[in-house]
Curated annotation (Swiss-Prot):
This is Small ribosomal subunit protein uS15. One of the primary rRNA binding proteins, it binds directly to 16S rRNA where it helps nucleate assembly of the platform of the 30S subunit by binding and bridging several RNA helices of the 16S rRNA. Forms an intersubunit bridge (bridge B4) with the 23S rRNA of the 50S subunit in the ribosome. Belongs to the universal ribosomal protein uS15 family. The keyword Nucleotide-binding does not apply. One of its GO terms (cellular component) is cytosolic small ribosomal subunit. GO terms for biological process: translation. GO terms for molecular function: rRNA binding; structural constituent of ribosome. Keywords: Ribonucleoprotein, Ribosomal protein, RNA-binding, rRNA-binding. Pfam families: Ribosomal_S15 (PF00312). Part of the 30S ribosomal subunit. Forms a bridge to the 50S subunit in the 70S ribosome, contacting the 23S rRNA. CDD domains: Ribosomal_S15p_S13e. The gene is rpsO. It comes from Chlorobium phaeobacteroides (strain BS1).
Amino acid sequence: MSVTKEIKTDIINQFGGSEKNTGQTEVQIALFSRRISDLTGHLKLHPKDKHSRHGLLKLVGKRKSLVAYLKKTDIGRYRKVLADLDLRK
């Protein structure tokens, strides 16, 4: 299941401040996290879906690099995002 437009705007407003602020690192991490959780649920129902698993691993890698970038640039925002999204270090 893909992320609907309403869910996407809610995430953007929550993490970006306004719906025009889509490029902020926190917003991108939150959107990736939502897509990752949706794909994880899909893979629990369909464990042999290798193409979706590959896409999931690509999303996890992209989110990991964004989290590393945020840690390098602004440690305060990094800690806030980890707390808000319940991500591990």
